[in-house]
Amino acid sequence: LRWSTRREILQPMSVETTTFRNRVDQEAAPVRSWSAFQYGWNVGGAGAHWAGMSWRFSPWDFQVATQTRERYGAAKMKGLQLQDWGVTYDEMAPFYDRFERIAGTSGIAGNINGEIKPGGNPFEGARSREYPTPPLKDTHWMRTFREASDRSGYHPFTIPAGNISQAFVNPLGVTMGPCTYCGFCDFHGCGNFSKSSPQAC
């Protein structure tokens, strides 16, 4: 209860005020619930209690203004505050790859050097090689969903995870243990060193 229900691993809202507004003409009000913004209150911060989903931003994400303008025309951008990052996916790809090697990210690549691979995310940017560890095991309901999605013509794939599917020694020489599927990833540290957290990798 201490971690999963009372959220003692998260920063108390009384420590630092965060405000939010939806539009410029609104008065900013204090946030009363962290919701998706879960600040860690422990050694390792949010890196210790994250669930482990390990996505790369897509090429579109890095150049959202340019991509939107090219696809929909400049007129569609009126009133939008879109801006390119100033760095491209291709420039960031080697750093994503390095992180995935250090973290032991598990998954199936969907696009290796422009070649779409079955079982992976067909919409991801091109990567140079496979994930360092295989994807986590499917549960019964994941298999059921995958089969139904396949039959419907969709492209289901297992989310790349910072939860290690098999024993792994990363490039820094750190040994990480395989996930035991205990179910305590979110809002908990991993005592098995199976999650790509600061204390594990």
Where are these regions (language model features)?
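N-terminal glycine-rich phosphate/pyrophosphate-binding loop and immediately adjacent elements
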Residues: 1-75, 81-98
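Cofactor-pocket helix-loop regions in the catalytic cores of large enzyme subunits
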Residues: 5-8, 131-138
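A short alpha-helix-loop-beta-strand transition element characteristic
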Residues: 29-35, 40, 109-111, 153-163
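A generic secondary-structure signal for well-formed alpha-helical elements
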Residues: 57, 61, 96-110, 149-156
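N-terminal leader/propeptide and maturation segments of large enzyme subunits in energy/redox metabolism
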Residues: 72-133
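Short coil/turn segments at secondary-structure boundaries
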Residues: 106-117, 159-164, 194-198
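Carboxylate/His-rich catalytic cores and anion/metal-binding grooves
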Residues: 136-172
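Helical element adjacent to the flavin cofactor pocket in flavoenzyme catalytic cores
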Residues: 140-151, 173-201
